[in-house]
């Protein structure tokens, strides 16, 4: 949710922490092909599958919807060791059961060409850079955006409101939507940080920036 990319050192540290435990890992890797500022995407996305101590206990989750711009299709996958997959299916069959057949055939055919997902880093980095350049002209403080299609900002310099209240005000008064990062904390921890999504047409981003520069 924070547009942070875990490094190899981070993953090794997690592996060390989990090693003496029986904890299972849910590794959400739906943005695996959206990593910025690197020579190649593969050099920076560190999947749990690459670390034996993590792979043995991990449910690795990814999304065809986010990779291929078809989020409305609600199609993804989970990779896990055979013993864990058996248990996963017992639960999953009652939640979803299956994905419709035409969508599965369509994705299988589309995946034959790797170019669409290999082009994602450059595609989204250009949008990120466009959005960040415009935000530099506001009083919002930019936080790093290393991957995904999200940009987090600190609102302390522009408002005393709590994150959720600020997001509601921003939508109502300026017509720009943001997400309060406190929504991702069980206790609603508020750091005065909100998140924008830049997976939009350039004209939409430029319109939003024009409004945000009034803050």
Could you tell me what each predicted segment is?
Residues 1-215:
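PLP-dependent class I/II
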């Amino acid at each position: 949710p924070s547009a942070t990319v875990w490094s190899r050192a981070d993953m090794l540290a997690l592996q060390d922490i989990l090693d003496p435990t029986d904890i299972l890992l849910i590794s959400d890797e739906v943005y695996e092909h959206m990593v910025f500022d690197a020579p190649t995407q593969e050099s920076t996305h560190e999947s749990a599958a690459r670390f034996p101590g993590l792979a043995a206990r991990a449910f690795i989750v990814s999304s065809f919807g986010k990779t291929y711009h078809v989020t409305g299709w609600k199609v993804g996958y989970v990779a896990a060791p055979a013993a864990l997959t058996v248990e996963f299916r017992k639960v999953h069959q009652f939640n979803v059961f299956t994905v419709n057949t035409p969508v599965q055939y369509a994705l299988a055919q589309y995946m034959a060409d790797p170019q669409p997902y290999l082009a994602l880093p450059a595609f989204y980095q250009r949008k990120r850079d466009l959005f960040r350049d415009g935000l530099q002209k506001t009083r919002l403080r930019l936080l790093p955006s290393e991957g995904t299609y999200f940009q987090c900002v600190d609102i302390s310099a522009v408002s005393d409101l709590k994150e959720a209240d600020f997001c509601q005000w921003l939508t109502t008064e300026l017509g720009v939507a943001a997400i309060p990062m406190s929504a991702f904390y069980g206790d609603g921890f508020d750091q005065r940080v909100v998140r924008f999504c830049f997976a939009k047409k350039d004209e939409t981003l430029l319109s939003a920036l024009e409004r945000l520069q009034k803050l």
